[in-house]
Amino acid sequence: MKPLSSPLQQYWQTVVERLPEPLAEESLSAQAKSVLTFSDFVQDSVIAHPEWLTELESQPPQADEWQHYASWLQEALSNVSDEAGLMRELRLFRRRIMVRIAWAQTLALVTEESILQQLSHLAETLIVAARDWLYDACCREWGTPCNAQGEAQPLLILGMGKLGGGELNFSSDIDLIFAWPEHGCTQGGRRELDNAQFFTRMGQRLIKVLDQPTQDGFVYRVDMRLRPFGESGPLVLSFAALEDYYQEQGRDWERYAMVKARIMGDSDGVYANELRAMLRPFVFRRYIDFSVIQSLRNMKGMIAREVRRRGLTDNIKLGAGGIREIEFIVQVFQLIRGGREPSLQSRALLPTLSAIAALHLLSENDAEQLRVAYLFLRRLENLLQSINDEQTQTLPFDELNRARLAWAMDFADWPQLTGVLTAHMANVRRVFNELIGDDESETQEESLSEQWRELWQDALQEDDTTPVLAHLSEDDRKQVLMLIADFRKELDKRTIGPRGRQVLDHLMPHLLSDVCAREDAAVTLSRITALLVGIVTRTTYLELLSEFPAALKHLISLCAASPMIASQLARYPLLLDELLDPNTLYQPTATDAYRDELRQYLLRVPEDDEEQQLEALRQFKQAQLLRIAAADIAGTLPVMKVSDHLTWLAEAMIDAVVQQAWVQMVARYGKPNHLNEREGRGFAVVGYGKLGGWELGYSSDLDLIFLHDCPMDAMTDGEREIDGRQFYLRLAQRIMHLFSTRTSSGILYEVDARLRPSGAAGMLVTSAEAFADYQKNEAWTWEHQALVRARVVYGDPQLTAHFDAVRREIMTLPREGKTLQTEVREMREKMRAHLGNKHRDRFDIKADEGGITDIEFITQYLVLRYAHEKPKLTRWSDNVRILELLAQNDIMEEQEAMALTRAYTTLRDELHHLALQELPGHVSEDCFTAERELVRASWQKWLVEE
């Protein structure tokens, strides 16, 4: 234990003079001297009750002793016969335990988290014991309150604020709300009361027992102002009245207060669960709620003004960077996202802060700085209050109390303590300002030129001049003014509430200022106003853009770069949430992490809620697609990587859809019984075309076929038994349904299953044996070409190995070169006649001569032609690696393979970028002439010449 500092050693002599004879100096331990020097509250308490000091010396406080509070208190109350006796015992018990907590805290015998837990549990124990004693007494006097069925009705107490969060201060008010379940009357009393009367009277007595000062002090100051209608409302409300209030009139700040609400005492009963379930939707919205930001900022502004008005300087709770700002930071995430992230629904601050870090909503460094600052500030606050059991958060001005705090906080002196304190509070303030901003500093609103507001507010005509647009060309200036005017007219057709109008009026000057600084102002503004028209009636999205300037900047740059992204954001405003974090926005998920991220994402949705599952799949896909496109636009992903990401994303979606369909089918029919003898599900999904070849684009559909290995005689083992092969057919149908169902978030993917054996006329799902037989005996050459770009994208190892073997066997069949050349060339000519360019003087990048499809046909032809001699050619299903294999196996010269690869990736890159611009896949006839000549020459060499 650290020895007392010099000023405190001097003060000890003053303490000694106050001590009574039984507490002679020589009989005291060094620990006792330290605590008595630090805390006047402990000093006064042990002078009045010397036996408490003896107990402390012989039985020092333990971290887990809060578990005994209830039994200790019951023992103290066992002989209480009247309310006066109850009040006395409650006060003495509270004081005795608070002395023990102060002792443990001063000497740092337990952690600060443990101190907060002990303080909160002590309050809960005292409240519940007082309530239960009074309930019995009131029932004896007035009868037992019952509902219409004659069931006894309890009084439930919601502990709010720090009490609810398990984070009570040393000297603190307690904020409570009283409720009872159902209406009815008392039974068994001398006269009948309705339940409202009974619980109101009981509530009044409970407040008096806890709050009224006596010669023994008080238990806690009770604050009931958080209840519905505050001081003007009923003291106690029924569940029905509570529900009506919060649904109809609950205000933002009441939501914030309710985050920490906790039912005191036994919280596992039927009524407790009912109350919790009733309040949860009010507190945690299912949608992301950005209105929180402005409300919290307004509250913070009110507090800051109060600090100034009351001269609350050096206030570690309410000042800049203080405890309240940490609480606000945590609550922002809870209230914005808590409805969708169960881990954010904790009442306690520190677990919620850990969840925020785990969800990457704050950086680990920021979260750790907040955690350390919070524990530092809470220890300082509790030590400060324990000096005199006084409710204060203002740092002392006198030398003695400064010396006390410096010593207890383990600093050499006061300047050293305040230096560390200042650093902690600066860290908190930085995070707070980055997240919530601060009305007290010069805001964007104040610094923004009045002229931008005029541009938005005044209905300017196309011919009007305005200085802020002087840098634009005349055409662009007219276009911008016309777009603003058209947007304002569009707004008049929509129902926008006063809050939405207020947010829009705040947002638009900032948006116009940023957009009009660009050279492409008119084009960008046209895309953004189209998006805004779709969200103006949904204030939460306007608030997102208004509250997060960085999100607005990302929106502008992405919409400027890509109308496809602008369209996606307009159709699915939920994606605006992705703009908040540039670290993830321009950094797509690692290619091997899509499955895992999707699995975690779906854990938030009930497994049996198909509608929510479908929405979640689509929302995940769109968010990931946006991130890939943003990285593509930013130039951080080359074309090959864009396709890799799009392909891995699609595979993750296939995995999740099959899993969902499987669970639904097994629940209905049971599993096919042949699976009892083997691992896996006996099912595979094969990807063809762009999916099989790792070459997906932004709007590619999925070419899929479904395989199973179910024997003819297999049956399912569920109550509704069906044929095993029928099970797999229904599974495949279910998968198609899950992909194609249109929800508010659109469809998942267009799926084309026509490449299956016998095409659209064939069975949707095929047995592995039938697939092999078809490929060997019935398939056309073009179907073998398609097999070159096929691979299993979902399936158990057995079926995957079987498919790979069939594919390899078919591709390595000996083929007569001339016949194959003719068949491949004629198929290409048919395609060109059917799908070729219908636009004069334009080059269709994919379908025209010298385009992407020609390269694909060249590689497919060469694999089918030479794989019999060089089986290694069957290894890959994508064109780039096939071209590498052709060079490595001396079929194509390396220079030609590299040139074709460059041409192929260049053309695909252009297709990606045209898709981002929502443009068709054709360009001017004079584009890519070198690449086209190269491909034509290669085509001539391999597929025309003898």
UniProtKB/Swiss-Prot annotation:
**This enzyme's EC code(s):** 2.7.7.89, 2.7.7.42
| Enzyme class, spelled out | transferase
Q: Which terms are listed as keywords in the entry?
A: ATP-binding, Magnesium, Multifunctional enzyme, Nucleotide-binding, Nucleotidyltransferase, Transferase
Catalytic activity, reaction form:
[glutamine synthetase]-O(4)-(5'-adenylyl)-L-tyrosine + phosphate = [glutamine synthetase]-L-tyrosine + ADP; [glutamine synthetase]-L-tyrosine + ATP = [glutamine synthetase]-O(4)-(5'-adenylyl)-L-tyrosine + diphosphate
Q: Which GO terms describe its cellular component?
A: cytosol
Query: Is Mitochondrion set as a keyword in this record?
Result: no
Q: What Gene3D superfamilies does UniProt report for this protein, alphabetically?
A: 1.20.120.1510, Beta Polymerase, domain 2, Glutamine synthase adenylyltransferase GlnE, Nucleotidyltransferases domain 2
What is the annotated signal peptide range for this record? none
Q: Which cofactor does it need?
A: Mg(2+)
Instruction: Give the start-end ranges of region Adenylyl transferase.
Output: 449-946
Which residue stretches belong to region Adenylyl removase? 1-440
- What family is this protein classified in? Belongs to the GlnE family.
Function as written in the Swiss-Prot or TrEMBL entry: Involved in the regulation of glutamine synthetase GlnA, a key enzyme in the process to assimilate ammonia. When cellular nitrogen levels are high, the C-terminal adenylyl transferase (AT) inactivates GlnA by covalent transfer of an adenylyl group from ATP to specific tyrosine residue of GlnA, thus reducing its activity. Conversely, when nitrogen levels are low, the N-terminal adenylyl removase (AR) activates GlnA by removing the adenylyl group by phosphorolysis, increasing its activity.
Its protein name is: Bifunctional glutamine synthetase adenylyltransferase/adenylyl-removing enzyme
Source organism per UniProt = Escherichia coli O6:H1 (strain CFT073 / ATCC 700928 / UPEC)
